[in-house]
Amino acid sequence: GASLFVLSPMVLARSFYHPALAGQWIILLGILLVIETPRLKSAGHLTAVWMIVLTGAILIHPYFLPMMGVLMVLSAVRLIDRQGWSGRYRWRALVIMTIVPAAVAVGIFYLVGGFSLGTGAEVYDLADKGFNLLSFVNPLGYSVLPAFPNRSISGETMMWLGLGVWLMLFLATWLWRGNYQVTWLRLRRYWRRHHWICRVGLTVSMLLLVFAVGVRIDVGPATLVQYSVPKPIYELWSAFRASAREAWVFYYTTIL
């Protein structure tokens, strides 16, 4: 099972031309922390753990920070929901448990000279390096597989899940047949019981997806829509100009 992650096309490609971004184990660690959140004893414990993880992530490569930030929010809302906090208290706890680790991580990154070479925001190519909605199914010529037409020519959009993962997904879908209605009812029941955590989690996940897609929404070779945002937002966004990378957390969640 570990080979599905270690030998994934995306990691292998990164290992040969961008080793820092091959350190995607940090994403798996973040997902594990979200799953294991109930084992964390308190808000202070969670804050300390994510402070260490976020600092490690940004020192490996700043592109990991937005993804890990979203996972941190999911972990925090899980703890808040488990503790049964409500009203303003839970929002206050959420802000503290997320802002403090992020501020410490960015502060340490600044102290080690992380901003000394600039932000890269002067390069405006968000449209060409955004996440294509068919990236998971397009091999882009990986190994002996053919490449399907793709709107972008950037290699950043290569997120082929791998033939083994797709076979596994099709097999799981076939084995799951007849249980879709039961699963849907369970999801609805969970939503009613934990509507706050579900809404917050869905919101931050959608925001990360929008961030990854960029200012041009592509589906294979076609562009559905291209939009503009105010210049200050665009410049800040352009600091993560290869925004497709922010979809890596969805990549690994799909495999899991």
Regions found by a protein language model. Give the residues of each.
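Membrane-interface helix-loop junctions at the exits of transmembrane helices
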Residues: G1-Y17, V106-L117, L133-V144, R199-R241
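Helical transmembrane-bundle signal
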Residues: F5, L33, M68, M72, ...
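Membrane-water interface of alpha-helical transmembrane segments
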Residues: E36, G44, L54, I58, ...
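Periplasmic/ER-lumenal interhelical loops and adjacent helix-loop junctions
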Residues: L94, T98, A103-N179, W248
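Membrane-interface helix-loop-helix junctions at transmembrane boundaries of multi-pass membrane enzymes
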Residues: Q83-L94, L169-L224
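Membrane-embedded helix bundles of polyisoprenyl
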Residues: G1-P38, A43-I80, M97-A105
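Short aromatic-rich membrane-water interface segments that cap or initiate transmembrane helices
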Residues: M10-A13, I58-H61, L145-M159, P232-A247
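Membrane-embedded alpha-helical segments of multi-pass membrane proteins
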Residues: L21-G30, G69, L161-G164, E246-T254
